[in-house]
Each structure stands twice: as C-alpha cells, then as structure tokens.
Amino acid sequence: MDKNAHEADGIIVSCRIKPHNAFRGPYESGVCKMMVVGLGKQKGAESVHSDGLGNMARNLPANAKVVVENSNILFAIPCVENAYDETALIEAIPTEKIFEREPELLKIAFSNMPSILVKEADVLVVNEIGKNFSGTGVDPNISGTWSTEFGKGGLQVKRTCFLDLRDSSHGNANGMG
C-alpha cells in the first residue's frame, strides 16, 4: 500500500463503480479495485494481475480484504454513472459493508450502461476512440470488441472501423491493433 495512505489516520475510498473492460466478476472497477490498485500502486496492480485476467474475479476481492484488514479504511464513497457519464448515484458505505454493497452497485452500473440497439452487425463504424472512453480506446461493454476471452457483452460484430482519435488522448491509439 502507498506509504502515505498507510500512515494516514484514516482512508476514505472514492471512485466510480462500473463494468470492467477485460473480465467479469462480482467486483470489477470499483471500491475493491481502488483499494488494491489505487492504494497499492504498482505492487498492488502486479499482485492482483499476477495470476492473469482469468483469476481476477477471485484475486481482486481477496486482495481487497487484505487491504481492509491491514489499513484504516474508514468508509467508501463510490458513484455510479448513467448512460451519459453523469452521476446517477453517490453512496457512503461503511467499511464492513463494502464487500456486500459493491456487487449490488455494480448491477446498477450495468443497467445504466449505454447500448447499441441491435445485437449483431457486420460492421461497426466508431467515429472516435480514445483513452478517455476506455483503456482500449472503445468500451467493449458497448462495442463488443473484447481484447480478452474473460469479458463478455455488447454488440456481436464481424468488423470494426475507427474513424478518428480523440484529441484528449494525446496520440494514444491503444486499441487500434
């Protein structure tokens, strides 16, 4: 864990809860991930990723429990967004309720995700990609363009075409290859 966080009188975990873009489980991108990767920095990220994405759904809450047991997490304040990236819900969660409440909030986040109205397409044309949309440039939860076998959902598409890169990505075209 980050030295400054570990030495703090208390830690309040603030984050978004949303579907992950590479795996599925009861804890994806949210409080547990913020405790393990956010507070754990590089070593936390290495620890939770060490067994590969196929074990992420198991490793993330297990590692988060170690963080809770060995630090002073006071509570968490996650938010859930709507389909327009606007805050739909903010909730304070006592530490002892994090592992119970986060999966429930993830279900709300899934139900709030935007979607493409058709389920299958031959070609998906994406106007803009960028790191601000997803680490892979486009959110596979919507586009179905998964870079891993451990994620699922979104459109079933045969070919995808990207027209432009968002300026705020500063040339980072991760997801193009």
Identify the meaning behind each predicted range:
Residues M1-G177:
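Anaerobic metallocofactor- and corrinoid-dependent redox/one-carbon enzyme cores
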